[in-house]
Design a protein with these regions (language model features):
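Alpha-helical transition-metal enzyme core signature, strongest for iron centers
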Residues: 14-15, 41, 45-52, 138
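Catalytic donor/gating beta->alpha subdomain of glycosyltransferases that bind UDP-sugars
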Residues: 26, 35-46
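Core segments of transmembrane alpha-helices
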Residues: 61-81
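Cytosolic/stromal cytosol-facing helical appendages immediately following the last transmembrane segment
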Residues: 29, 33-37, 50-61, 85-92, ...
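Hydrophobic alpha-helical membrane-embedded segments
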Residues: 2-31, 103-112
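Helix-coil boundary and interhelical linker segments in multi-pass alpha-helical membrane proteins
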Residues: 1-7, 79-95
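Transmembrane alpha-helices and immediately adjacent membrane-cytoplasm interface residues
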Residues: 14, 77-81, 98
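Alpha-helical hydrophobic/aromatic positions enriched in membrane-embedded helices and signal peptides
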Residues: 8, 15, 41, 96, ...
Length: 172
């Protein structure tokens, strides 16, 4: 029935939240000089605010490599360890994890496309559909005071998190 599609949606929404939480933390905490985390995770987010179009000048591997290196091994291990007999809970778990990790893997790509001046027609259609982060939606993050709309997978959670002032409350 309806529970497996609901798990897919839940996984994708969770990826959107994870992207927002990570983006919020990278923008506001830590140092770019910290070993490993600084240059790999924090610096790209901070530099992105200086040159938002830079992400569009990187190749697929540079944009998505770190997220791929984190999500694909987890996905493979998860599916390798799933029991063979697929009951409803197993299917729901697989659907949730699959869409969560798919969203994490492609978050930076969706973010890049939101900054691309002239994306391909199919990407524009995905933007209009709301399935991936849309440029006009993401622009709110690049508007002073730069303290909202951190979710960059689909952006679905941004209005809710802004209305409830979640990031402001965490920062206080």
């Amino acid at each position: 029935g309806w529970m497996v599609p609901l798990a897919f949606i839940g996984g994708y929404i969770s990826a959107d939240f994870a992207s927002g939480l990570f983006h919020f933390l990278a923008d506001n905490y830590g140092s770019t000089s910290k070993k490993f985390f600084g240059p790999v995770f924090i610096r790209p987010f901070r530099e992105h605010h200086v040159d938002p179009l830079a992400i569009t000048r990187h190749d697929f591997l540079e944009v998505n490599g770190v997220n791929c290196a984190m999500s694909v091994p987890i996905l493979l291990a998860t599916y390798a360890l799933l029991p063979v007999g697929a009951n409803l809970w197993t299917l729901m778990f697989a659907a949730y994890i699959g869409l969560f990790l798919f969203g994490i893997f492609l978050t930076n790509q969706f973010h890049s496309w939101a900054h691309m001046p002239n994306p391909p027609r199919i990407i524009r259609a995905l933007h209009r559909s709301g399935l991936i982060l849309a440029p006009d939606h993401h622009q709110k993050h690049h508007t002073p005071p730069f303290n909202t709309y951190y979710c960059i997978t689909s952006g679905w959670l941004n209005p809710i998190l802004a209305r409830t002032r979640v990031w402001e409350r965490v920062y206080e």
